[in-house]
Regions:
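Short active-site neighborhood of thiol/selenol oxidoreductases, capturing the structured segment around
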Residues: 47-77, 83, 97
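Thiol/disulfide oxidoreductase modules built on the thioredoxin-like
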Residues: 117-119, 127-179
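Hydrophobic h-region of N-terminal signal peptides that target proteins for export
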Residues: 7-18
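Positively charged n-region of N-terminal signal peptides that target proteins for export
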Residues: 1-4
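Loop/turn elements at helix/coil->beta-strand transitions in domains of secreted/extracellular proteins
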Residues: 59-65, 91-98, 117-122, 148-149, ...
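Cellulosome-associated attachment modules in secreted, modular CAZymes
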Residues: 185-264
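N-terminal "domain-start" segment that seeds a small globular fold
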Residues: 18-56
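Structural microenvironment flanking redox-active thiols in thiol-disulfide oxidoreductases
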Residues: 75-118, 129-137
């Protein structure tokens, strides 16, 4: 009953999406589809807002790559190993890859697709394939109305910066690689260092981080302010390792500074 209710909610949400979102458009953060593979969250559905730094709980933005595919598509099978390679390189650097599959059972189930290609990134199930659309399902028709594989890249501001259908071999994958690396380079919060104590990101002439009383003062300001603390600041200031920033972290930081723990 719970799964049926979630499906109905997703259907109602997506009825409002009549346009094809393309390059330059802002991707709809409330768009989501049911998880079907590599669900590590315990949630029934994955939404784009989970990776929107202005809406999610951590404040961490992501660069998002959506690959739309069908289980019968030979070109999708040729492309998918590249997606796993990208995932293994950039999973910890702010890239989220989402496989959006449809037409399951021809021949792969969702689980079979994940297992056969050894995928580690999330797979969602596109809904209503061919029921309301000439081709593909809700998700595919939100971003394109052509054919698979279809690749959409969304930057940390939730702007679509790339949208293309078809598999263009290694040359096409190299192009996607360049677009993704450029997008990550433009997103400090996607790839920032979470070095403990490095709050103000100052460096010596030898490019070594300088951790001193200025960092302590900035941590104090963060703790006393009402501003949202992003994931970088949380990692850099969480001296107790409890996932929170409070006066205990401030005291621990001050003690370590006094003891010379950060002296080179």
């Amino acid at each position: 009953m719970k799964n049926k209710l979630i499906t109905i909610i997703l259907l109602l949400l997506n009825l409002s999406y009549s346009q094809v979102y393309t390059v330059g458009d802002t991707a709809p953060s409330d768009f989501g589809l049911p998880w079907c593979g590599n669900n590590t969250t315990g949630n029934d559905s994955l939404f784009l807002m989970d990776f929107n730094g202005t809406l999610n709980e951590t404040g961490r933005p992501y660069v998002i790559w959506i690959m739309s595919f069908t289980s019968w598509c030979p070109y999708c099978e040729q492309e998918v190993p590249y997606t796993q390679d990208f995932y293994e390189i950039y999973a910890d650097s702010g890239l989220i890859i989402i496989g959006m599959g449809s037409d399951w059972g021809q021949p792969y189930t969702c689980e079979g697709w994940v297992e056969n290609f050894g995928l580690g990134y999330p797979i969602i199930s596109d809904l209503d394939t061919y029921n309301e659309y000439e081709y593909g399902g809700q998700g595919m028709n939100l971003f394109t109305d052509t054919y698979v594989p279809s690749n959409i890249i969304i930057n940390h501001n939730m702007e679509i910066i790339y949208s293309q259908s078809g598999f263009d071999g290694e040359a096409g994958m190299n192009n996607i690689f360049n677009i993704i690396t450029s997008a990550l380079d433009q997103c400090y919060l996607c790839t920032c260092s979470e070095l403990l104590g490095d709050i103000d990101h100052s460096f010596s002439n030898e490019d070594e981080p300088i951790i001193d009383v200025i960092d302590l003062l900035k941590l104090s300001d963060l703790i006393s302010s009402d501003d949202q603390i992003n994931h970088c600041e949380r990692g850099q200031g969480d001296f107790t390792g409890d996932g929170l920033l409070n006066t205990i972290d401030l005291f621990a930081f001050a003690t370590m500074l006094a003891e010379g723990a950060f002296n080179n």
